[in-house]
Every structure is written in structure tokens, then in C-alpha cells.
A protein has these predicted regions:
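Bacterial N-terminal signal peptides that target proteins for export
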Residues: 1-9
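Extracytoplasmic entry segments of secretory-pathway proteins
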Residues: 2, 16-26
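Bacterial N-terminal signal peptides
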Residues: 8-16
Length: 186
């Protein structure tokens, strides 16, 4: 009974938080917020499996990869036209000031999502580590995930990796982009 009540309370808080977080967002800002929520939920739902806490399900990985890919690349960048940084948006001005890096990260997510689908047949190699402070690796500096002068991830190499490691790369791309281009919530 207590567990059910806690679950219902948590679910209610999540719905209220989502409603409040999108309050006032309309049009393209609302569309991109909805896309980001879909990506966040995809990563959240797959994380226990990638950490070895639930049974591995190839179809769930394929569905997750498709969801990430559907919201990445040009689909993502099209939702950030200049002038769409209204008060309801968490988008920082740096997106438009450093469009090349933002666009590269969106394209990188598309590549990594495709590689995640390809890696779905590869058994998990090691459980995804618990979150650590990756601010140096995933920030705005020249690193594989943070943009700059580093080489782009090789889709063929990623596709050969254990699926949980490719998932970790996808999560790192999300984190790097948010670190550089997303304003903190109030």
C-alpha cells in the first residue's frame, strides 16, 4: 500500500512538474520541449537495463534508438530558429552564437542513435557506471562529445561496441549539449 501511494505521488509530481516546466510554451518552443522530454524519457527508461538492473531486451533498445534518432539531427536543429528564445524556453543564447557546435551535437546524437540500433545485437559488455562528474569531458571544450576539434564518433566503431557503452555515449552527448546550451531551471 505504501509503495503504491509513493508511486502515485511520484507520478503526480512528475505530471505537475512537466506541466509547470512547459507553462507558457507555445508553438516551436513547445514542440522542441516536447521532443527533449521524449528523449529524456527514453534515456531514463533504458538506463536500468543498461546498468544491468533489468533484463536486456533488444526490442526496447531498438525502440529507444529510433526515438532518439527521430528527435536528433536536422529534426532537432529545425526547432531552434533564430528568435525562438522566449521566456518559456530553456535554450541559451549560445545556441545561436555558436550554431556550428550546436548543430554538430545534434548531428552527433543522430549518428550515435543509429549506432545504438546497430549495437542492439551486441550483448552488454559492462554495466553503465553510476553517474560521475564528466564536466571536463562533456563540456564545451575539444573532446569527443563536447565539440571543438576532436574527431567525430565513428558509427562503425560504435556499432561494434557493447550496447551499454554506446548508450553511455548517447547519454554523454545529451549531457554535453545541455551543459553548453541549456539554461538551468529556476
Amino acid at each position: 500500500m505504501k509503495k503504491t501511494l509513493a508511486t502515485l505521488t511520484a507520478g503526480g509530481l512528475l505530471v505537475a512538474t512537466l506541466a509547470a516546466s512547459h507553462q507558457g510554451a507555445t508553438g516551436i518552443v513547445r514542440d522542441r520541449m516536447d521532443g527533449m522530454v521524449a528523449m529524456r524519457d527514453t534515456v531514463r527508461d533504458l538506463t536500468p537495463m543498461m546498468r544491468g538492473r533489468t533484463e536486456y531486451a533488444r526490442e526496447a533498445v531498438l525502440d529507444a534508438a529510433a526515438a532518439l534518432e527521430r528527435h536528433a539531427g536536422e529534426t532537432m536543429t529545425a526547432l531552434f530558429p533564430e528568435g525562438s528564445d522566449d521566456a518559456a524556453s530553456y535554450a541559451r543564447a549560445e545556441i545561436w552564437q555558436d550554431w556550428e557546435t550546436f548543430e554538430a551535437m545534434a548531428m552527433r546524437m543522430e549518428v550515435v542513435a543509429g549506432a545504438l540500433a546497430e549495437a542492439a545485437d551486441n550483448p552488454p559488455g559492462s554495466a553503465m557506471p553510476e553517474p560521475v562528474d564528466n564536466s571536463t569531458m562533456m563540456g564545451g571544450g575539444p573532446s569527443m562529445m563536447g565539440g571543438g576539434t576532436a574527431t567525430e564518433p565513428d558509427p562503425e566503431m560504435l556499432a561494434q561496441m557493447p550496447v551499454d557503452r554506446v548508450f553511455t555515449v548517447a547519454a554523454q552527448v545529451c549531457s554535453a549539449c545541455h551543459t553548453q546550451f541549456r539554461a538551468a531551471r529556476n
